[in-house]
């Protein structure tokens, strides 16, 4: 054994050639060389990437924004007006530029994740703050004071936006918000308002491909669980990062599953029935999880595992609700049931299950309608008898999930490209509408940010460098209104100048009609949450790059192509 290790050691030592150069030992091991840049040079290259992505994204802004055609490495080209989709599709060969592009993608993705819309606005604001910030730093402004000034201005603007917010509740107001976010398509706005009316403002609304030329709304029996897939290896659609199971069988287990052998009968049942499998358990661990992933990727079995929702007694109750909805039995020792002795009739069914990173939607459960109604009646009765506010809230939540249903927005179109583009708009409109219901609305078209510049006129700062930070934000707040007008074919500077002369904060420019109107009365409104999130995310990322003093990049290998695959072609 010693001789084997010695030979191995000597062979490793000899395989790495070393030579003495100028008194230093240089190893021929393949360590990646680095390019280091400092100061203006480091920021300039990254700023170029930010600007090029922003220019591509900003053409989509407003009611007369233009389409962007994106080439994909597979399938046909994608045509879209969705800012985050455009941003994600862009990458550069130059590494410094690509870092700038990635920063814009971070802004767009973060805004989209929190507010569901406003990605184009966030990108435009990022470019505006960043360009002025980098110029100021290059001119000798103290970057830390500049940062303080920008943060002070952002806080003041957010406060101003919240003070002018108007809460919405009527179907017409909801329709207006959804229509704006759908780039002026009122039909989409009306369908979203109808969906919210049917399932409630907190209800589940999903977006799916339709089978006709027209958009349709369908309310189906379903349940949403606040649990996503245990492992991303269960994903079936890389583009949407979802796992979709059509007509699956469903196993509901009360405890953790870690033993391979305990799952064999369930997997056999799935294979024999040629149906996907959904597993709901406290957890699926180690060998059992590995076997499921192996069967999916090499055995061709569509399978997904999620953790049971809730904790303690609430978890047990939720699993019982799910069992009633799907026609399953909860496998537990208390009921004398075990995985080793499982029978097909103990498994539940559903027409479709969609699992994301954060939640699971089960549509058309295979449970007996009479039993479901009896379960709902039990919950209503328990809710009336309960004296605990907490218990009442939990019971009402369970009742809503069991009886409320799920609204499915089926997007129609003449081609796959058209359906894809319309789905982007419907998703944006749906998210923006939820945001509007949550935090209220303000005048749209960029005018709320434009008038917020007046709130910064008298903002007190400690020195001129901080004042410069405030001025940067003031100038950046004009960019959205300018861009919307310019995309509609009007002089953005003239429009912005005229609006700033007004005292009425609802007065704005309707770019679709080319008129100056009362924006709220005209139905041109934005959710406060969308604009607030876009502004804060843009400032955050802009400050990261403005305060960057050095960049360390891996030097490109001349023998290999320096291509970074775009996120859209990878399905991200």
From Swiss-Prot:
Family statement drawn from the similarity comment of this UniProt entry: Belongs to the chaperonin (HSP60) family.
Function: Implicated in mitochondrial protein import and macromolecular assembly. May facilitate the correct folding of imported proteins. May also prevent misfolding and promote the refolding and proper assembly of unfolded polypeptides generated under stress conditions in the mitochondrial matrix.
Subcellular location: Mitochondrion
InterPro entries the UniProt entry points to: Chaperonin_Cpn60_CS, Cpn60/GroEL, Cpn60/GroEL/TCP-1, GroEL-like_apical_dom_sf, GROEL-like_equatorial_sf, TCP-1-like_intermed_sf
Species in which this protein is naturally found: Arabidopsis thaliana (Mouse-ear cress)
Transit peptide per record: 1-31
Domain of life: Eukaryota
Protein name (record): Chaperonin CPN60-like 2, mitochondrial
PROSITE patterns (UniProt xref): CHAPERONINS_CPN60
UniProtKB keywords: ATP-binding, Chaperone, Mitochondrion, Nucleotide-binding, Stress response, Transit peptide
Keyword Iron recorded: no
Cystine residue pairs: none
Swiss-Prot/TrEMBL GO biological process terms: protein refolding
